[in-house]
């Protein structure tokens, strides 16, 4: 059995690599997908595809169209979603992706520090699992493959 997992969350730290390395070391048959991790490319993809836009609002709008398309396609292919909420960055896209997963009936693991319990309580309540660390999420992934 093999799974595709969409990794939703901020693109400024290496948390995705940490998950990929740890699941690889456990030999878990998982393929990971997610948003464009190159922030500049993500911001500029609209103009890269559609040409230069007349202002910053339209530039952002075109980039959002393409990034939302990417998210929809990859999340629809995913078996489930892991969404990481950290304390350092605003998490609007993570919240949007987690909500999309819930709306599509995709199983969802939320990783969030205890300090974000209150602002994320409703979202956490809709997730299948809410944990505080990447290691706890990895243990949940590993459990999928255990037979005893």
UniProtKB/Swiss-Prot annotation:
Please give the name of this protein.
Uncharacterized protein YtoQ
Q: Which organism is it from?
A: Bacillus subtilis (strain 168)
The record's gene field reads ytoQ
């Amino acid at each position: 059995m093999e799974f595709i997992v969409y990794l939703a969350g901020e693109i400024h730290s290496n948390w995705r690599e940490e998950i990929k390395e740890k699941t690889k070391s456990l030999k878990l048959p998982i393929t990971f997908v997610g948003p464009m991790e190159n922030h500049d490319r993500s911001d500029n993809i609209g103009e890269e595809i559609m040409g230069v836009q007349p202002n910053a609002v339209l530039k952002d709008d075109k980039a959002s169209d393409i990034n939302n398309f990417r998210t929809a396609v990859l999340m629809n292919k995913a078996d489930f979603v892991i969404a990481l909420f950290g304390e350092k960055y605003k998490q609007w896209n993570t919240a949007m992706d987690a909500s999309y997963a819930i709306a599509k009936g995709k199983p969802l693991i939320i990783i969030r520090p205890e300090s974000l319990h209150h602002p994320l309580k409703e979202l956490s309540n809709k997730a299948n699992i809410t944990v505080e660390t990447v290691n706890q999420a990895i243990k949940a992934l590993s459990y999928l493959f255990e037979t005893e």
